Amino acid sequence: MAQLAKFDVPEELTNKALEALELARDTGKIKKGTNEATKAIERGNAKLVLIAEDIEPAEIIAHIAPLSEEKKAPYIFIKNQKELGAASGLGVSCATVAIVDAGKAGEMVQDIAQKLEALK
């Protein structure tokens, strides 16, 4: 498996990001899937991008982190694609999700973004 993550994220922060995703899914707006997330990042709409680490082949998501860096969108790596799919409300695994409107998770997303910036 290719090593995509440039920084280690504490499990506590990963869990908080998944919790924020679930809240944003219910009260805001999210974009599910690599193509939809890529469009949200390119348009500058992504508030937080969640990327599954266990995607094969890794080339499918290899562009997400550099694009997020370029567009100043905070991103976090999630260990498991099934976990990411479940948190985004899908019955299947998911490679990438972008939170576009955080809804009631707004403060949570801002806090996660600040902590991620400090880790880099």
Swiss-Prot record:
One of its GO terms (cellular component) is ribonucleoprotein complex. GO terms for biological process: ribosome biogenesis; translation; tRNA 5'-leader removal. Part of the 50S ribosomal subunit. Probably part of the RNase P complex. The keyword Ribonucleoprotein applies. It is found in: Cytoplasm. It comes from the Archaea. Pfam families: Ribosomal_L7Ae (PF01248). Keywords: Cytoplasm, Ribonucleoprotein, Ribosomal protein, RNA-binding, rRNA-binding, tRNA processing. The keyword Disulfide bond does not apply. Multifunctional RNA-binding protein that recognizes the K-turn motif in ribosomal RNA, the RNA component of RNase P, box H/ACA, box C/D and box C'/D' sRNAs. It comes from Methanosarcina barkeri (strain Fusaro / DSM 804). Belongs to the eukaryotic ribosomal protein eL8 family. Its main location: cytoplasm. GO terms for molecular function: ribonuclease P activity; rRNA binding; structural constituent of ribosome. This is Large ribosomal subunit protein eL8.
